[in-house]
Curated annotation (Swiss-Prot):
<feature type="compositionally biased region" description="Basic and acidic residues">
    <location>
        <begin position="1079"/>
        <end position="1090"/>
    </location>
</feature>
<keyword id="KW-0853">WD repeat</keyword>
<dbReference type="GO" id="GO:0034271">
    <property type="term" value="C:phosphatidylinositol 3-kinase complex, class III, type I"/>
</dbReference>
<dbReference type="InterPro" id="IPR016024">
    <property type="entry name" value="ARM-type_fold"/>
</dbReference>
<dbReference type="GO" id="GO:0006623">
    <property type="term" value="P:protein targeting to vacuole"/>
</dbReference>
<feature type="repeat" description="WD 2">
    <location>
        <begin position="1368"/>
        <end position="1407"/>
    </location>
</feature>
<dbReference type="InterPro" id="IPR015943">
    <property type="entry name" value="WD40/YVTN_repeat-like_dom_sf"/>
</dbReference>
<keyword id="KW-0072">Autophagy</keyword>
<feature type="domain" description="Protein kinase">
    <location>
        <begin position="24"/>
        <end position="293"/>
    </location>
</feature>
<dbReference type="InterPro" id="IPR008271">
    <property type="entry name" value="Ser/Thr_kinase_AS"/>
</dbReference>
<dbReference type="GO" id="GO:0000425">
    <property type="term" value="P:pexophagy"/>
</dbReference>
<dbReference type="InterPro" id="IPR045162">
    <property type="entry name" value="Vps15-like"/>
</dbReference>
<feature type="repeat" description="HEAT 6">
    <location>
        <begin position="626"/>
        <end position="664"/>
    </location>
</feature>
<dbReference type="InterPro" id="IPR011989">
    <property type="entry name" value="ARM-like"/>
</dbReference>
<feature type="compositionally biased region" description="Basic and acidic residues">
    <location>
        <begin position="1014"/>
        <end position="1023"/>
    </location>
</feature>
<protein>
    <recommendedName>
        <fullName>Serine/threonine-protein kinase vps15</fullName>
        <ecNumber>2.7.11.1</ecNumber>
    </recommendedName>
</protein>
<dbReference type="GO" id="GO:0004674">
    <property type="term" value="F:protein serine/threonine kinase activity"/>
</dbReference>
Length: 1706
């Protein structure tokens, strides 16, 4: 036997892997076990796996049955046990067996001995997971068989996995032969035995048997003991035998080292010798809940972590490129769940309910003031006061004044984070913090990193100090050099808060600051971002304080013998050596902090210095009195010479804390003179800060009594300054001074000084409010302004004694007294002074206290000013108060001049040598005047838009958007260099520029409208002026004559009437110019080969007035010339310019400007007269000539005839039938949207021979562009016309938006813009869209979707301006209307909500609710406007005249022609259309399904008899919030009246308060469940004139209505109810009655309904005669789903039914 075994050779493993596991590579051996060899390898995707190999040296032994059984067990627990890692692959060959599982770096054995060591909370969390894992395995019938610390895997976030299931190993082992145990179980050769004692049996009893759960429980108990003891394992093999035989091994004494008695008892029970006495894993979990394991493990943390980290994901690892997003989403999820005001389990676990009110200490910035903190966090004030009061009570301040707001100091902010928390907080932090730390180095977005750092601040409050420094700090330090400044700032604040709460340290952290923190923080001194340096300046004092604290703790450790000395020869404690080391460390620390502070004090940014000033107190404590005087004070004095008033203000705000440390002498020598001079600072905020500092220093008794008296004399006049803050601060100084004296001094010194300023005698001053009531009031602003003018304008004045031009040397400098007399004044020019303040004791010049008006000496000039002041209400006896303010007025004026001079000097330093050559040659670049046709430009810009133009995110100012952007011919322009010097092109002079640009108008009389136009467009770059494009413009080189009115600046102001971006702007009447005769225009039009040129109208663009152009008001012209031969152009490509160089930067810039201008161009064509502007003509029954057709005069009102004249059927909705119909603005054609993705434009054509015969012709059709890989087009779901133009926007089901300019007569269309709504799910289709014109003339599109998203798009750039989610609880959005100017949009939903959305700010402004589903909405025009007899050009969205389609002169009897040959145009009054669009009245059609049996209805089935659809229309004024009229049909009297009721929007901000139907939140599937009826109620407003057409009459709206599910249409006349009639059923009998008066509610009840009649004697022509056989049966009626009204040539009602058929009715 032995000889045979010795001849078997073990194969080479790399050969085995290459032959049998070719998908794995890069093997690394992880051990030389005798039983299973372990290798770490990688698969083809790069993921690490662990492979266990058993080499079968005896081929006759089959391993298939064993491996198959193991495979079944692993498949049973795969993805079902979160705490188990099964084998993902098993393979058996003739040579070996392979077990493959995912590789995890650490196991429990390694983690126990790795720093930072596990805390008790983390150990309990791991124990809980292992019990849960083994319980799940046992429940599935799987036992492990070999549980030990090496077979328990631990991730970086402390998630535990049971791995290496060993059910294939023998269950029982011989107790007299340890070789079997060593071969199968002791793979690490540690001689550790966790095998249950019952598994060791005599050799005679060895037999195969299954594993039992009790065996795993014993092994798990051994692992628990090893985890808690952290020393040696619980059992070796010999100790286990002794324990089994009741030998000398005392288990209880070993487990007594565990402090928790409950944990001891649990482990003793698990290690019971009798297997029957051991409980199941689930029983242990239930028994020790609340004792060993906290309840939060069961209720919250375990399930939350499973959903967060997806433990089963280890079996199917994510792609490497998804790792960052995976970790980022994990961080963001935790942040959203923990941060208040969430009310979920995790948030409640980590925060005591209602303790913080949404504010926590981690949100308190270290470098902001208290006011800024309160403004950002409205609820913070009460929270801060409550915490501050709590801390003060702990410190013994019981008599703290209630309601006061203490200033936040860094020490207070430190203490806020140290609030005690309960046990749940500790366990929550122990579980969640490792998850955050494990992902913090893998996230790549700024938001996720900042969220992670915020979570670290929250969770680290609940862990021990050692974990803060050993576990958390290294992870946060990695973000100190992040690329984002916000992340670096957050990391620095996190580190500061982390170390500031440490109270005890381990010996390893004794030199943390000197060796670790400060070397890494040093780079913040030179960070490029000033905010980062400012943050470090605010954190440095706290870090210095903690560094000193750590130094003291290290000294204590040395004295205790815990921390050894650096030198090895000092074996015993040497206190002298320890003291020396302490002083050396202290000196090194001070030198380091001093270097950092000196750098920050001299920083160039005032923000950095202000941040350091806000935290001076800790630095003064750190440095001591001497160092504070030498280092800090010497730098701070220079701050007062800075022009930044906020820096000076911060200096005086911090001076009180600094004065405590430098002492009274330094205050008297250095601080007091500076404060006195600051009393005349020109900035009121600085004066307020100085007065506040005076008050604080007086309260601290840092001034002598005589100094306080002098300060009081200076401050008293300031109570009259017209500034409430200064007055309040001055009163505070007076009150503090009064309280600092005893009673005798008050009566003898203070009261005489106060008495002149008091309006009545005051016995005692016990409050500021009382002092404010009795002291003189402030002077008015007008008086103060007059006083200032008096000083500035008076020449010979006795009132102003000192020379007004006196410089700063006029201030008396005296070392003997504080208030000295005026000395000899020396005149100096202000510009010669570089300093605002001096550093010596000073007194205000000419300071003389005046207590009565008689002491004043006034000249004649002074008397005039005094009389003016008297007339303003100032009593004569109080003029002395103004006299005491003379010094304040004079010195503030002088100081202000000095500061302004310094600011100007700083600017001049940038250009010290203005005449020095810069060696930069300015170059003027011209655009080539030869431009391609508009169609090619449109195609080119469309192709370039997605590739380049959309990637340019260039912000423009409002005025820049007003400049024309249409392609146009461009000539020379001026160029401004970087220093503001305007240069002219040398080769082209301004006098050489002349252009002739004409345009032929489309008006009937052939009148040509032309004008001048600015050919320049100011870009964002001030150095270059670029042309704005107009595709239809061209330079006429034959007749170089054109107007060129210029403004004072030499530039040209333009107004392009073809520009869609200038719709709402007004021309100044004097600036409108018309030139060139019609003959020249005709000639030029021929030379241009039919290209109509845009009229060039030069004017100033008014940015305030939004009215449209009413017409041409001036015909004056100015001419200039241009020599096109001098223009150098490039001929290589479309992006042509005069630039001939090859500089790639210049070329890229020109390409960017060209692409941006082309992308923003949207030529929607000329505007047309809207059809509602004319009366509704009657249908002609007799033959009339075409000429007579133009002279039709209406003699009576229109009424529907009830005749169907045509029908269009393209197949069912599945085959491409009609879904929606829209009429062009002038009713010359209509557009149908098909379910096959095709848009078709139709015209009505009638025969001249047979007037009563009519047919429809499809003039053009086009389909939406297919995306790559798509065979069929998506259905076109919605569309709209862009203003009164032929530009049509449509959207498909996948969110693709296209804008086409339709030319129906020529059967052409042009794609002018295209895009796609982002993040639109296929099931979230567009339900409504509406276009409107913005204030700058650009066209905007508002789209709402089924899932209640509102998308706001710029049609020209085709980019999303905003995309917001409406409240899902309101239901699905069904319709939207948009106001003129795109200020607001009104959205209707399926649950009856009217949401008024502010498009400017993207917020919900107001809401109303009505008990019905809102189906359609229309913005009604202003019907009060009357017709005018004056012809007018009504401007469209591009400000061009109305296009009147000329009539046809054909009289052939056999010819057919478009019906739009006769369109009567009724002009409106000036700007009538704009005023109409300004209306706020909306017609709302609604429907509701009444459920009599309270049963649900399947909308796909027929509506049962117990359900009835009720519908109606309500006219609602959005501005007033009032209902004007209501129309109801089949309305149940038991239903609530459908009148919109206002609902506050506050409920939308709180998730729990917004459950309309029930108390539960609703998801997307519940959007359409309340008021859904099978079919919508369709309506369309119709406008007609009352009475005869002659004269000035009013228009009135009629409403075309199709009730919900009805096949018939009805006309409702709210002005004459009896005139209401049916359109499609003339035999219908119905009644309509008024049931309410306020508002009027009309109810229609049908008594009889017949089927729609057949064609009334007229033939029914179709789209294609070949499709006649596909017509649906006439007797089969379908509900109406859409309607429209065609005004011309006479009234036609377009009806779309649910089958996809379109019918035309008169």
């Amino acid at each position: 036997m032995g000889i045979q075994l010795s001849t078997i050779q073990t194969p080479q493993f790399h050969e085995l892997f290459e032959e049998e596991l070719p998908e794995y590579h890069n093997e690394r051996s992880l051990g030389d076990s005798h039983f299973l060899r372990t290798f770490r390898m990688q698969d083809r995707k790069g993921y690490d796996v662990l492979i266990k190999v058993f080499v079968n040296k005896l081929p006759e032994i089959s391993l298939s049955s064993i491996v198959n059984l193991l495979k079944e067990e692993q498949e049973n627990i795969s993805y079902r046990v979160p705490n188990a890692v099964p084998y993902i692959k098993t393979l058996v060959t003739l040579r070996a067996a392979y077990l493959v599982r995912p590789y995890v770096t650490h196991n429990l054995y390694d983690r126990i001995s790795t720093r930072p060591f596990l805390e008790l909370t983390e150990k309990k969390w791991i124990m809980f997971q292992l019990l849960k894992g083994i319980s799940d395995c046992h429940r599935l019938g799987v036992c492990h068989g070999d549980i030990k610390s090496e077979n328990i895997l631990i991730t970086s976030w402390n998630w535990a996995y049971l791995s290496d299931f060993s059910s294939f190993k023998p269950t029982y082992l011989p107790e007299d032969n340890p070789a079997d145990y060593g071969y199968f179980f002791d793979t690490s050769s540690r001689r550790v035995c966790n095998i249950a004692p019952e598994r060791f049996v005599p050799a005679s009893q060895l037999q195969p048997a299954p594993l039992s759960p009790a065996m795993d429980i014993f092994s798990l108990g051994c692992v628990f003991a090893e985890l808690l003891l952290e020393e040696s394992p619980l059992f070796t093999l010999s100790q286990l035998f002794s324990y089994k035989a009741h030998g000398s091994y005392d288990l209880q004494s070993v487990l007594e080292q565990i402090e928790d008695k409950s944990t001891q008892n649990m482990i003793l029970s698990m290690l019971d010798r009798d297997p029957s006495q051991r409980l199941s894993a689930d029983a242990y979990l239930q028994k020790y809940r609340g004792t060993v394991f906290p309840a939060c493990f069961y209720d919250t943390l375990y399930d939350y972590c499973i959903g967060l980290v997806d433990p089963s994901g280890i079996l199917s690892a994510k792609q490497p490129n998804d790792a960052c997003s995976l970790y980022g989403s994990r961080i963001d999820d935790i942040y959203r769940d923990i941060m208040p005001p969430n009310n979920n389990d995790i948030s409640n676990l980590m925060h005591t309910p209602h303790e913080y009110n949404g504010i926590d200490s981690y949100s308190v910035p270290l470098f902001t003031t208290l006011d800024e903190f309160y403004n950002k966090n409205p609820a913070a004030k009460n929270w801060y006061l409550r915490l501050y009061n709590t801390m003060q009570e702990k410190k013994g301040f019981e008599d703290k004044e209630q309601g006061s707001t203490p200033a936040p100091s860094p020490s207070v902010i430190e203490d806020i984070s140290s609030i005690e928390t309960d046990e749940n907080h500790l366990y929550g932090a122990a579980v969640l913090l490792p998850i955050v730390l494990s992902t913090i180095r893998h996230v790549n977005t700024r938001e996720s990193k900042i969220n992670a750092l915020s979570l670290v601040q929250i969770l680290s409050r609940n862990i021990c100090d050692e974990s803060k420094l050993d576990t958390v700090l290294p992870f946060v330090m990695t973000l100190l050099r992040d690329q984002y400044a916000d992340v670096r700032i957050s990391a620095l604040i996190t580190i500061t808060r982390l170390v500031s709460n440490v109270t005890s340290i381990a010996p390893i952290n004794a030199f943390l600051f000197q060796e670790y923190l400060f070397p890494d923080l040093q780079h913040f001194l030179f960070d490029m971002n000033s905010r980062t340096r400012a943050t470090y300046a605010s954190c440095l004092p706290i870090l210095a304080k903690q560094a000193s604290k750590f130094l003291n703790l290290a000294q204590s450790l040395r004295n205790a013998g815990i921390l050894s000395f650096p030198e090895s020869e000092y074996e015993n404690i040497n206190h002298g050596k320890a003291e020396l080391l302490f002083e050396t460390g202290r000196h090194d620390l001070v030198v380091t902090v001093e270097r950092h502070v000196s750098t920050l004090l001299a920083d160039s940014s005032s923000i950095v210095r202000r941040s350091l000033l806000n935290a001076l107190a800790p630095l003064c404590v750190f440095f001591g009195k001497a160092k504070s005087n030498d280092l800090i004070l010497s730098h701070l004095i220079t701050y007062l010479n800075d022009t930044d008033w906020m820096l000076r203000c911060a200096f005086f705000e911090s001076i009180t804390g600094l004065s405590i440390f430098i002492g009274p002498r330094s205050v008297d020598e250095y601080i007091l003179p500076l404060m006195l001079q600051a009393l005349v600072d020109p900035e009121p905020a600085v004066l307020e800060s100085v007065l506040g500092s005076f008050s604080g220093l007086i309260e601290l008794h840092l001034f002598e009594k005589l100094v306080v008296v002098d300060i009081l004399q200076l401050v008293l006049p300031l109570v009259a300054v017209p500034n409430a803050y200064i007055r309040r601060a001055a009163l505070s100084v007076i009150y503090s001074a009064y309280q600092s004296f005893d009673d005798i001094d008050r009566d003898c010194i203070v009261t005489p000084l106060l008495r002149p300023y008091l309006m009545s005698n005051l016995c005692d001053i016990n409050s500021l409010e009382k002092l404010d009531q009795f002291i003189l009031p402030m002077v008015s602003d007008s008086v103060w302004s007059t006083l200032t003018r008096w000083y500035e304008e008076s020449e010979n004045s006795s009132f102003w004694k000192c020379d007004k031009d006196a410089s700063y040397s006029s201030l008396d400098v005296s070392n003997d007294s504080l208030l000295g007399r005026t000395k000899n004044l020396q005149k100096r020019e202000i510009m010669h002074h570089a300093e605002v303040y001096t550093h010596k004791k000073i007194s205000l010049t000419g300071h003389v206290i005046i207590t009565s008006t008689e002491m004043l000496e006034l000249s004649e000039d002074d008397q005039k000013w005094a009389d003016i002041i008297k007339e303003m209400g100032v009593d004569v006896k109080h003029l002395w108060v103004l006299a005491n303010l003379r010094d304040y007025v004079k010195k503030t004026k002088i100081n202000l001049n000095g500061i302004n001079y310094k600011r100007q000097s700083g600017l001049r330093e940038l250009n010290t040598y203005p005449n020095a050559p810069l060696h930069i040659l300015p170059e003027t670049i011209f655009w080539n005047p030869e431009r391609p046709p508009s169609s090619s430009i449109a195609n080119e810009t469309f192709l370039d838009r997605n590739s380049y133009a959309e990637s340019i995110q260039t912000s423009r100012s409002y005025n820049d958007d007003l400049i024309a952007r249409d392609p146009i011919a461009y000539v020379g322009t001026d160029m401004t260099n970087a220093f503001g010097t305007t240069t002219k092109p040398k080769d082209v002079s301004q006098s050489d520029i002349k252009v002739d640009i004409n345009r032929e108008s489309n008006s009937d009389n052939g009148e040509t409208i032309t004008g001048t136009h600015d050919v320049y467009r100011q870009t964002d770059n001030p150095e270059i002026k670029l042309p704005s494009d107009t595709a239809s413009s061209k330079v006429d080189t034959h007749n170089p004559t054109v107007t060129q009115p210029t403004d004072d600046t030499g530039g040209l102001n333009s107004y392009n009437t073809e520009n869609p971006l200038l719709t709402n702007n007004t021309l100044e009447p004097s600036s409108v110019e018309a030139i060139v005769s019609s003959k020249d225009s005709d000639k030029h039009a021929k030379e241009s080969k039919g290209k109509s040129l845009a009229p060039l109208i030069s004017s100033r663009v008014s940015t305030n007035d939004t009215t449209n152009v009413a017409g041409i008001r001036s015909q004056r012209s100015f001419t200039t010339h241009i020599d096109l031969k001098k223009l150098t152009t490039r001929q290589n490509g479309a992006k042509k310019s005069s630039y001939t160089g090859t500089n790639p930067c210049v070329l890229n810039y020109l390409n960017k400007i060209y692409a941006e201008a082309a992308a923003s161009t949207l030529n929607v064509g000329a505007a047309v007269s809207p059809s509602w502007a004319s009366n509704i003509p009657l249908r002609r029954r007799t033959k009339v000539s075409a000429k007579a057709a133009n002279k039709i005069v209406q003699t009576h009102e229109w009424h529907p005839e009830g005749s169907r004249v045509a029908q269009i059927y393209l197949g069912s909705l599945l085959d491409g039938g009609t879904k929606k119909v829209l009429v062009s603005p002038d009713s010359s054609f209509f557009v149908t949207l098909g379910s096959d993705g095709v848009v078709r434009a139709w015209q009505l054509v009638e025969s001249v021979r047979h007037i009563s015969t009519m047919r429809c012709e499809c003039r053009l059709s086009y389909g939406h562009t297919r995306r790559n890989g798509e065979r069929n087009r998506f259905s076109v779901v919605n569309g709209c016309f862009l203003g009164n133009t032929y530009a049509f926007a449509s959207v498909t089901q996948d969110g693709s938006v296209e804008v086409h300019r339709l030319d129906v007569n020529n059967q052409r269309h042009t794609l002018i813009s295209a895009g796609r709504i982002p993040n639109l799910d296929f099931s979230d289709s567009v339900t409504s869209m509406e276009a409107s014109t913005f204030h700058d003339g650009s066209i905007r599109l508002v789209v709402v979707t089924k899932w209640s998203r509102i998308v706001y798009l710029d049609v020209g750039m085709m980019r999303v301006l905003s995309s917001d989610q409406l409240p899902l609880q309101c239901g699905s959005a069904t319709s939207v209307v948009v106001s003129e100017g795109c200020n607001w949009a009104l959205i209707g939903t399926t649950k009856g909500w009217l949401l008024l959305w502010d498009l400017r700010f993207g917020t919900l402004s107001c809401s109303w609710h009505m008990p019905a589903r809102i189906d359609q909405m229309h913005l009604l025009l202003d019907v009060t406007k009357k017709r005018s007899n004056v012809n007018e050009y009504t401007s469209g969205n591009n400000n061009s005249p109305v296009t009147k389609v000329p009539g046809s002169s054909s009289t052939s009897s056999s010819s057919t022609q478009p019906i739009n040959s006769t369109i009567p145009i009724n002009p409106l009054e000036n700007h009538g259309m704009l005023n109409s669009f300004g209306s706020t009245t909306v017609s709302i059609s609604f429907s509701v399904l009444t459920n009599l049996d309270n049963k649900e209805v399947n909308l796909e089935d027929a509506v049962p008899a117990s359900h009835r659809s009720a519908s109606g229309i309500v006219n609602f004024d959005v501005e007033k919030g009032k209902t004007e009229e209501v129309f109801l049909e089949n309305w149940n009297s038991s239903l609530t009246s459908p009148i919109p009721v206002s609902v506050g929007i506050d409920a939308f901000n709180e998730k729990k308060k917004f459950d309309i139907d029930s108390g539960n939140d609703m998801g997307l599937r519940d959007l359409n469940t309340k008021f859904d009826s099978p079919w919508p109620c369709i309506s369309s407003p119709i406008y007609r004139y009352r009475g005869p057409s002659a004269g000035s009459v009013e228009r009135e709206p009629l409403f075309l209505i199709a009730a919900s599910g009805s096949p018939h249409a009805f006309i409702w006349n709210p002005h004459n109810v009896s005139a209401s009639s049916s359109v499609t059923n003339d035999s219908e009998s119905s009644k309509l009655s008024l049931i309410h008066n306020k508002p009027p509610i009309y109810q229609k009840v049908s008594e009889q309904q017949n089927v729609r009649p057949k064609s009334s004697g007229v033939s029914r022509p179709l789209l294609f005669l070949q499709q006649q056989k596909n017509l649906p049966s006439e007797n089969r009626l379908h509900p109406i789903v859409d309607m429209a009204f065609l005004y011309q040539p006479y009234a036609i009602v377009l009806i779309v039914d649910a089958f996809g058929s379109l019918e035309l009715w008169t």
